[in-house]
């Protein structure tokens, strides 16, 4: 109530049109311009009589390679990277296919990490956090150490090996799914479905808690 617009910038997806939320004081426009500087959101408000009568909204895509870098900021970044430059640019492999991390349930970069965890830890199943950030790589592009850090630096320093029953795995999947798909937004905790390697399952987002996961 009393808020005309909320400009969001932390969703991983650019939302092309505002969500209009009706409330006791009128309506509130909620926008999201994605993350990592992908878009610049432009919101024009037509104000009449002290109230918003109309609005125009658009997302302007940012092509960073076409924009000249700010000299001072560029120098600051290069100075900070200098001690680690050789290590960050080390080439680890070349990808044969598109590596991305954009799906709500999985992505090819997720699968690469899961395969690596299972191989390194000799595990039948692997779990990985449900993130959707990180750099996408085109087929034939080198995977550098920086790309690896880009994908894993937040939580992967801690990797554990545990024995889990099928019932425990289903409980984990149901709990994460409820954080995402609970019809009450106050119980939704954001993020995405935990990534799973070595196990296939079926998820019904519209089912109730305890009944979303099947076909394991």
What is the role of each PLM region?
Residues 8-15, 95-97, 128-132, 168-172:
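A generic short-segment signal for beta-strand/edge and adjacent turn/coil regions
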């Amino acid at each position: 109530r009393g808020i005309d617009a909320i400009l969001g910038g932390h969703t991983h997806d650019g939302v092309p049109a505002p969500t209009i939320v009706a409330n006791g004081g009128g309506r509130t426009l909620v926008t999201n311009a994605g993350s990592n500087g992908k878009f610049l959101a432009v919101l024009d408000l037509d104000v009449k009589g002290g109230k918003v009568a109309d609005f125009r909204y658009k997302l302007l895509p940012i092509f960073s390679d076409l924009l000249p870098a700010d000299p001072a900021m560029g120098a600051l970044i290069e100075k900070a990277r200098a001690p680690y430059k050789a290590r960050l640019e080390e080439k680890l492999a070349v990808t044969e296919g598109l590596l991305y991390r954009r799906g709500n349930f999985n992505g090819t970069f997720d699968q690469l990490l899961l395969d690596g965890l299972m191989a390194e830890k000799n595990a039948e199943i692997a779990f990985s956090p449900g993130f959707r950030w990180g750099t996408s790589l085109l087929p034939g592009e080198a995977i550098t150490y920086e790309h690896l850090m880009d994908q894993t630096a937040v939580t992967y320093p801690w990797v554990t090996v545990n024995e889990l029953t099928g019932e425990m795995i289903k409980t984990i999947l149901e709990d994460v799914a409820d954080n995402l798909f609970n019809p009450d937004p106050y119980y939704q905790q954001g993020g995405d479905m935990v990534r799973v390697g070595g196990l296939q399952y079926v998820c019904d987002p519209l089912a109730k808690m305890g009944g979303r996961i099947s076909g394991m």
